[in-house]
Curated annotation (Swiss-Prot):
<keyword id="KW-1113">Inhibition of host RLR pathway by virus</keyword>
<comment type="similarity">
    <text>Belongs to the orthopoxvirus OPG067 family.</text>
</comment>
<feature type="domain" description="BEN 2">
    <location>
        <begin position="233"/>
        <end position="328"/>
    </location>
</feature>
<dbReference type="GO" id="GO:0016020">
    <property type="term" value="C:membrane"/>
</dbReference>
<keyword id="KW-1133">Transmembrane helix</keyword>
<keyword id="KW-1090">Inhibition of host innate immune response by virus</keyword>
<keyword id="KW-1048">Host nucleus</keyword>
<dbReference type="GO" id="GO:0003677">
    <property type="term" value="F:DNA binding"/>
</dbReference>
<keyword id="KW-0812">Transmembrane</keyword>
<dbReference type="GO" id="GO:0042025">
    <property type="term" value="C:host cell nucleus"/>
</dbReference>
<dbReference type="GO" id="GO:0052170">
    <property type="term" value="P:symbiont-mediated suppression of host innate immune response"/>
</dbReference>
<comment type="subunit">
    <text>Interacts with host CGAS; this interaction inhibits CGAS-mediated type I interferon response.</text>
</comment>
<keyword id="KW-0677">Repeat</keyword>
<keyword id="KW-0899">Viral immunoevasion</keyword>
<feature type="domain" description="BEN 1">
    <location>
        <begin position="112"/>
        <end position="222"/>
    </location>
</feature>
<dbReference type="Pfam" id="PF10523">
    <property type="entry name" value="BEN"/>
</dbReference>
<dbReference type="GO" id="GO:0030430">
    <property type="term" value="C:host cell cytoplasm"/>
</dbReference>
Length: 341
């Protein structure tokens, strides 16, 4: 008679379990089995093609987001090297003007008038500042005036965003200059990385509080990227790539105008131009071919019917030529008043 030890008992249990498992598996493969047992399986196989398309869309969306975050991180790393180089250059520049004047060295500086005005303006903001966080906020207003326009696109910007998908980051290269100015004004030119991080967090809180007062108006909203379609696949891809960089339709219009009419903005001749000829007011009409390109890019991205989109697009073009907000220095007094409060 077989004596069942503990080991034998355990082995017997395992054998019986395996036998039962194999029996169940073999029954599940039997063609006579009731179809009801496959209800769940059939449920998820009915729309297999549709499921594949959805998975592909999710995969592409994830890849695009991953690419975006990678590019942002790469820009931040490059900006760190830029900060160190810019700070050395700034300190040398300040030493230079101790023994001479800006007027004397201006001829050797590219775009000397713009450089002179920039340095003069940011110096005035710095001298009036009593608080590092308010100084940073005022310099953001000064250096990014287009973000604080009627479309309120600043709502989507942060210095240190919690989510790099939900919020955009201000240009790290301009932030480097702001950081250098703050370190000069309050920290005797010492590099204060931790302090800068704290200041950035405080400024983000100020941006959040200001953002709560506004919303992006419907006329400035953009279609979801997957709903944008151009005249061809190539056009669609190009338009989507431009839209990925924008928060509002006004920003998209500005980007296209700065590309197509670069010379007018660079020379300052833009002041004499509008969408249509206006002889009474002395305005010259813009190139029709280039305006058609603006419409072809912008209209598919607006969540309204094409006739309405065309009218809104024309309004935004005229608005930008009346007051191109990318040109800094127009709001100097506003910035000084802000830091003086």
């Amino acid at each position: 008679m077989l004596i069942l030890t503990k080991v034998n008992i355990y082995m017997l249990i395992i054998v019986l379990w395996l036998y039962g498992h194999n029996f169940i598996m073999s029954e599940s493969q039997c063609p006579m089995i009731n179809d009801d047992s496959f209800t769940l399986k059939r449920k998820y196989q009915i729309d297999s093609a549709e499921s594949t398309i959805k998975m592909d869309k999710k995969r592409i969306k994830f890849q695009n987001r991953a690419k975006m975050v990678k590019e942002i991180n790469q820009t931040i790393r490059v900006a760190q090297t830029h900060y160190e180089t810019l700070k050395l250059g700034y300190i040398k520049f300040k030493r230079m003007i101790r023994t001479t004047t800006l007027e004397d060295i201006a001829p050797s500086i590219p775009n000397n008038q713009k450089t002179y005005k920039l340095f003069s303006d940011i110096s005035a903001i710095g001298k009036a500042s009593q608080n590092p966080s308010k100084m940073v906020y005022a310099l953001l207003l000064y250096m990014f005036p287009n973000l604080f326009g009627d479309d309120h696109r600043f709502i989507r910007y942060r210095m240190h965003p919690m989510s790099k998908i939900k919020h955009k980051i201000f240009s790290p290269f301009k932030l480097n200059l702001i950081r250098i100015l703050v370190e000069e004004r309050f920290y005797n030119n010492e590099c204060r990385s931790n302090k800068w991080r704290i200041i950035g967090t405080q400024v983000d809180k100020m941006l959040i509080a200001e953002s709560d007062k506004y919303t992006i108006d419907a006329r400035y909203r953009l279609r979801p990227i997957y709903r944008i379609k151009g005249k061809s696949e190539e056009d669609t891809l190009f338009i989507k790539q431009m839209v990925e960089q924008c928060v509002t339709s006004q920003e998209l219009v500005e980007k296209v105008l700065k590309i197509l009419f670069r010379d007018l903005f660079k020379s300052g001749e833009y002041k004499a131009y509008r969408y249509d000829d206006d002889v009474e007011n002395g305005f010259i009409g813009l190139d029709t071919l280039k305006l058609n390109i603006v419409h072809d890019i912008v209209e598919p991205c607006m969540p309204v019917r094409r006739p309405v989109a065309k009218i809104l697009c024309k309004e935004m073009v005229n608005k930008y030529f009346e007051n191109p907000l990318h040109i800094i220095g127009k709001n100097l007094q506003e910035c000084i008043d802000f830091v003086s409060e």
